[in-house]
Amino acid sequence: MRDFSFADDVPTAWTYHRATARWLFNASAGGESPPVRPGREDGGLPWTPLPEGAPLQSSLADTLRARVSCRCFAAEPLTLAQVATVLRASYGSDNRSGPVMQDRPPPSGGGLYPLEVTLLVRAVDGLEPGVYHYVPAADGLEQVQQLVLPRPFLTYLFMGQPWVAEAAVVVVLSFAGGRSLTKYGDRGYRYALLEAGHTMQNLNLAVAALGLGVVNLGGFYDDELAVLCGIDVDQELPLYCCALGRPAADPSDRMAMRALERGTPDG
């Protein structure tokens, strides 16, 4: 059995990684930081301010232990307060640096925060089903479109993952390239992937601390998801998603969760 080879076995991944590699002859300190807005804000869309969030009272140690993937969700809505807590903990702005930089929980290359957050809402008290865009600087949600998201469509969109269709909310992280690539060139794409990972882990920990369930999603049809979210893939790219809701059983009880996934009673 031969050894694995990046170049031979996964040439597309190899080409991407080498194309964004740095050596002495092509390294630079990066360009000037471009003028940036705190984030995309379409304006004129129906607006929902976020309420006071649900409290996070779990210790860090307990939260880390509780963070597991949940693939069985109960048919119960989330509260808007729970959604507010999750959004603020993952990518919310605390205005520590004033209205321009808008410091947020995850580390970000150059402090440019190039990610955008879109919600596909099925069941949240206080929100109509549909697509919403989170605006951290104003701490609220723009309603991109009101629509019921059919279960078969969500399962299809996320490449046959049926648990997505049972979740209360799907969170979509997308990358607004102009915010960081102008400064860092193609290397900035790596930084965006890292930031998406940091952001999603923050989200996972907030969900765990609230006693809710979450599963991360890397498989989806990119262009169709972008159309649903109302984003232009020439300027903004979906990177990473997750489905969250109330778990049908304690997510840390792996035997119970696996039994639910199989559709059989526990024990």
Name what the model sees in each region.
Residues 1-178, 196, 219-267:
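N-terminal accessory segments that position/regulate proteins before the catalytic core
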Residues 179-183:
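Short acidic/His/Gly/Ser-rich catalytic and metal-binding motifs that mark active-site loops
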Residues 186-195:
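Short pre-catalytic strand/loop immediately N-terminal to key active-site residues, enriched for Gly-Thr
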